[in-house]
């Protein structure tokens, strides 16, 4: 759960109208709101003959391929089976999320030659080669990405540009266990690996994203002595956007106006979520993310969800169900 918590991350303390705990915001608060909305609808309209389905899949953070992607492949999001989808991600109770940026994940390995650490000139340090890669990123790739801007309404503001995170770096020998009290081996590392997390814009083709990184690596191969690398793609997700005129967008918009007395804000998410599978595998375009919570709190110490926000979102979801599913008077 990370360091810095002042509340037990697994106890769901309620303090000043906020429920604290790991996952309360992202996205158990939204899931709870959707369950309350569905239960209230069924209780209020016991003769309703249609179907309301809540899918509580568990692997969205690791790609969603065993959850929503599997359901989509089995036809559960076929427009003949399901007509409207709300994913209760924490984009805030007065926002409607139309889609998300794209993502490209890859591993880069720089290669060297092992040798005794007292004679590094007899080997070739893969970590130093990786340092050259990182320097290219700092001087060329990061400034280029920061200069790009999208017309997608991505929040927060910093995500309106392309971004890349270096998720991990590993080089040389395996780290020793905490209880190891010896000295590290004296070896020149012959391998160094980083995992990159590149988030790209609707205006950027995926091939351009790949080629930009590979081009920097090829440039180093040409200019740096003995530089060698291997680039392995881990996963890719294309950007997704639902049209603002879609029925689910218009219906939730009106519910926000009616329940909260304010105009909704239309946004896009900096990271991908299960809409990518519903859109491209399920072929259902009538899908949004809507739910309580502040996206900036996701995965943070003292993550919380406000009870009042959950109630308001449940009311919006309930009103949406009535509009979409009941006969018009």
Listing of model-derived features with the role each one plays in the protein:
Residues 36-43, 132-138, 319-322:
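Short glycine/serine- and small hydrophobic-enriched flexible loop segments
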Residues 2-4, 46, 97-103, 185-189, ...:
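Short glycine/proline-enriched loop/turn "hinge" motifs that connect secondary-structure elements
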Residues 1-22, 43-48, 294:
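Acidic/His- and Gly-rich active-site-bordering loop/insert found
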Residues 2-15, 99-109, 288:
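Acidic-glycine-rich active-site phosphate/pyrophosphate-binding loop
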Residues 27-101, 329:
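Acidic/histidine-rich catalytic neighborhood of metal-dependent amide-processing enzymes
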Residues 98, 117-180, 185-188, 202-228:
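Acidic-enriched catalytic cores of C-N bond-cleaving enzymes acting on peptides and small amides
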Residues 142-176, 228-329:
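An extended, acidic, His-containing surface patch that forms the Zn2+-binding/catalytic region
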């Amino acid at each position: 759960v990370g360091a810095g918590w002042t509340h037990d991350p697994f106890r769901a303390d309620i303090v000043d109208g906020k429920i604290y705990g790991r996952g309360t915001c992202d996205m158990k608060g939204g899931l709870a709101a959707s369950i309350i909305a569905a239960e209230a609808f069924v209780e209020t309209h016991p003769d309703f003959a249609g179907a309301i389905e809540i899918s509580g899949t568990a692997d969205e953070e690791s790609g969603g391929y065993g959850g929503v992607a599997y359901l989509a492949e089995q036809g559960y999001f076929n427009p003949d089976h399901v007509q409207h989808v709300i994913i209760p991600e924490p984009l805030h109770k007065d926002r409607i999320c139309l889609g998300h940026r794209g993502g490209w994940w890859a591993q880069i390995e720089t290669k060297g030659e092992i040798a005794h650490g007292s004679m590094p000139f007899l080997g070739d340090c893969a970590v130093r080669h990786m340092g050259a890669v990182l320097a290219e990123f700092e001087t060329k790739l990061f400034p280029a990405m920061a200069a790009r801007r999208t017309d997608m309404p991505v929040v927060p503001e910093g995500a309106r540009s392309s971004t890349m995170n270096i998720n991990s770096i590993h080089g040389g020998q395996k780290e020793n266990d905490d209880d190891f009290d010896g000295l590290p081996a004296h070896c020149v590392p012959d391998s160094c690996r980083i995992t990159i997390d590149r988030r790209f814009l609707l205006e950027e083709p995926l091939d351009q994203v790949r080629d930009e990184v590979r081009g920097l690596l090829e440039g180093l191969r040409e200019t740096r002595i003995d530089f060698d690398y291997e680039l392995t793609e881990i996963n890719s997700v294309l950007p997704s956007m639902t049209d603002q005129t879609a029925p689910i967008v218009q219906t939730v918009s009106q519910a926000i106006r009616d329940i909260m007395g304010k105009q909704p804000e239309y946004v896009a998410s900096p990271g991908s979520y299960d809409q990518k599978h519903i859109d491209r595998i399920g072929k259902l375009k009538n899908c949004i993310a809507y739910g309580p919570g502040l996206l900036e709190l996701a995965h943070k110490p003292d993550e919380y969800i406000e009870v009042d926000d959950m109630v308001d979102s449940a009311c919006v979801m309930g009103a949406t169900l009535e509009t979409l599913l009941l006969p018009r008077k």
